[in-house]
From Swiss-Prot:
Origin species: Methanocaldococcus jannaschii (strain ATCC 43067 / DSM 2661 / JAL-1 / JCM 10045 / NBRC 100440)
The keyword Protease appears for this protein: no
Molecular function GO terms recorded: DNA binding
Name by which UniProt lists this protein: Type I restriction enzyme MjaVIII specificity subunit
Subunit note: The type I restriction/modification system is composed of three polypeptides R, M and S.
Record InterPro entries: Restrct_endonuc_typeI_TRD (IPR000055), Restrct_endonuc_typeI_TRD_sf (IPR044946), Type-I_RS_S_subunit (IPR052021)
Functional summary from the UniProt entry: The specificity (S) subunit of a type I restriction enzyme; this subunit dictates DNA sequence specificity. In the presence of the R subunit the complex can also act as an endonuclease, binding to the same target sequence but cutting the DNA some distance from this site. Whether the DNA is cut or modified depends on the methylation state of the target sequence. When the target site is unmodified, the DNA is cut.
Domains as described in the record: Contains two DNA recognition domains, each specifying recognition of one of the two defined components of the target sequence.
Domain of life: Archaea
Record carries keyword DNA-binding: yes
Keyword line: DNA-binding, Restriction system
Family: Belongs to the type-I restriction system S methylase family.
Length: 425
């Protein structure tokens, strides 16, 4: 038997509990059929996987699939099974919805369960995902924001016939599987890049026949070892008062805008346009390399970025450092990749001050020693790493297009504007 899904546009709607849905659909309220179980703070948690320990379901693990904390099972923890529905209850991203993995529920999350099984679980997950932005916008609390219980319980979910729920969930799940495949391809490329970086920054890209021991390990005979301050300086940005910011104007590049190898503008603060003339020394240009000076290492990754044309104009904020090149002996792209290397991360981590908000002092940072090949080899090394980055970017854009398509069809299917049914042959 061959099963083909048929899509068609719905023409007949009704109003129900404030929602416009197809005539053969119902509408249910979250509080009427969902119960939630709050996570607990674990008694014993370690950094490595041991027998009798489960992964701790942090948001980082649920997003990227890499477990970093493990909890000892004492039968007091809340166990999560694969594909359980989880809601981040507390924190800056409160309201985010996750599909669970086998592990221990974190203290900032709740596990959602149906009191009476009226809905396909995967359909419920996607329906809640559609409400995620709204839920995030309605959090409350002056300190640590949390989900507003009344608002959450009052959310209305359209309810198609069970078979259609499963079909909708299957379609959206297929999108997610495709996105997951691309994520794995990106992961493979990132691992290849990491391995290449380790080799390039110790062996080089040219065929070197002789090597020497140095303060930073074995390197090719014709390489130098220099302190960062011999080739670059670091400029820290300026603090601006809250009253100086405005709704529109020139972007202010803060620590939150410095990602792991790129610049992000998901949250943007603006300063008046005339600040470009008022503070010309703080104006950032395409090609500038910036580093977070507070919490420069998060999750084992360095918060560093290089500005592109699209990022201009922007003004440098406090505790973000811009590298100022003062020597022609070093290539800008080479330094960018070197600053993301395991070697540099290790050296930087030794010099951080503090635990809650670790930071680096610029004079200390500039004393870090780095390998310095001849300029021609630096450029060749950077070119090889750039070629992998280009492949990663192609995959990232491919993923972005699929996510856009999924978002569009998700909205159409979950509101009943487009219907789906199986044709059996």
């Amino acid at each position: 038997m061959v099963i083909i899904m048929q899509f068609y546009k719905e023409e007949n709607f009704k109003e129900m509990h404030g929602l416009r849905v197809p005539e053969d659909w119902e509408v249910v309220r979250i509080g009427d059929f969902i119960k939630y179980i709050k996570g607990k703070k674990p008694a014993v948690m370690v950094d490595e996987e041991l027998e009798g320990y489960y992964p701790y379901l942090s948001t980082e693990y649920l997003r990227d699939g890499i477990a970093s904390k493990f909890v000892k099972i004492t039968n007091k923890e809340i166990i999560v099974n694969e594909n359980d529905i989880l809601l981040l209850w507390d924190g800056s991203n409160a309201g985010e919805i996750f599909l669970g993995k086998k592990g221990i529920l974190s203290s900032t999350m709740v596990k959602l369960e149906q009191k009476n099984k009226i809905m396909d679980d995967l359909y419920l997950f996607y329906s809640l995902k559609l409400k995620e932005s709204f839920l995030k916008s309605q959090t409350k609390g002056t300190g640590i924001p949390h989900v507003d219980k009344k608002i959450f319980e009052n959310i209305k979910i359209p309810l198609p016939p069970l078979e259609e729920q499963k079909q909708i969930a299957k379609i959206l799940s297929d999108f997610d599987n495709l996105i997951g495949t691309i994520n794995k391809q990106i992961e493979v490329l990132n691992k290849a890049k990491k391995g290449m970086m380790k080799k390039l920054f110790t062996k080089g890209v040219f065929e070197h026949k002789s090597f020497k021991k140095s303060e930073i390990g074995e390197i090719p005979e014709d390489w130098e070892v220099v302190k960062l301050k011999e080739v670059v300086d670091i400029q820290s940005g300026k603090y601006f008062k809250y009253s100086e910011f405005c709704e529109n104007g020139v972007k202010c590049l803060k620590i939150d805008n410095v990602g792991f190898g790129k610049i992000f503008w998901e949250t943007v603060s603006f300063l008046p346009e005339d600040y470009l003339n008022k503070y010309p020394q703080l104006v950032l240009k395409s090609g500038d390399i910036v580093l977070a000076l507070n919490r420069p290492i998060i999750g084992g990754k360095i918060k560093i970025g290089i500005l592109k044309d699209i990022d201009e104009p922007a003004i440098l904020y406090q505790r973000v450092g811009r590298f100022i090149f003062k020597s022609e002996k070093i290539d800008k792209q080479f330094l960018f990749y070197l600053l993301m290397s395991e070697y540099f991360k290790k050296e930087l981590s030794k010099l951080l001050i503090g635990t809650d908000q670790p930071y680096i002092r610029t004079p200390v940072l500039l004393n870090i020693k780095i390998p310095l090949p001849h300029l021609e080899e630096q450029k060749a090394m950077a070119e090889r790493l750039k070629s992998i980055d280009n492949l990663i970017e192609i995959k990232r854009k491919e993923k972005e297009q699929i996510e856009k398509a999924k978002k569009k069809i998700m909205n159409l299917l979950l509101t009943g504007k487009i219907r789906v049914k199986n044709l059996n042959f």
